[in-house]
Amino acid sequence: VKLLKLKHQWVKINKNDFIKNLNKIIIKRHNPLPTLTSYIQWLMYQEISKENYKVVLSGNGADEIYSGYYDHYLAQLNDLKKNDFNKKYKKWKKNISPLIRNPKFKDIEYYAKNYKKILIGENLSKKFGVKRYNIRLKDDKKFKYLLKNRMYNDLRYESLPIILMEEDMNAMFFSIENRSPYLNHKIVKTIQKIHPRYLIRNGYNKAILRDMLSNVAPKHIIKNFEK
């Protein structure tokens, strides 16, 4: 923050308030929080409301639209096996593979055949649920490329819908309007027309977004493989 010279305000988290806040949240929204991230975001909106801000802009959708997840690398490598695979594989092996902790996200061929099983993960209802549920992953195939299909399903059915729903509820709790400018339909349709080889480039995901921000964002962020 100091390096970027940004105005900011830290959100302090008091663990003693957790149960009290959780009860307050659940009573108002009538459903549980899916992740701890939702609670932290609620705390952030609480602080924003104290400053009397009425509109919040978020970066929601950037990972889904521009290819920002680790499994997107594997999808792209499977798409490009007969093209510039070797060059991109070397970049991935050197810069990205060491960052990945899940071994299933390091096996290119296994991913192509089992990505639905990997993304669903363990069915915890069999361990902890009163009732067991069979979890299925919707997998629309709108494009001929695995990467673009994965991004489409991320956008429509998987990660983004729950993220948007959670942010809407947290924002509405404090009468704040939240907006996600990356989800402009013109941006989405334009990116969907681009060949997958250009979405991840030189080992960097979100390559197009990095290009657009190259004269705006600091180099240590643009050139960070973890961003």
Residue ranges of predicted features:
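ATP-dependent adenylate-handling active sites, centered on carboxylate activation for C-N bond formation
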Residues: 1-135, 169-215
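Charged, low-complexity surface segments at secondary-structure and domain boundaries
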Residues: 8-11, 134-145, 227
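PAPS-dependent sulfotransferase catalytic core
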Residues: 217-227
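Intrinsic disorder/low-complexity signal
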Residues: 62, 106, 138-139, 153, ...
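Short Ser/Thr-interspersed hydrophobic loop/turn segments at strand-loop and sheet-helix junctions
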Residues: 155-170, 191
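Structural motif
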Residues: 34-35, 141-155
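Residue-level recognition of hydrophobic positions within alpha-helical transmembrane segments
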Residues: 60, 144, 150-152, 162-164, ...
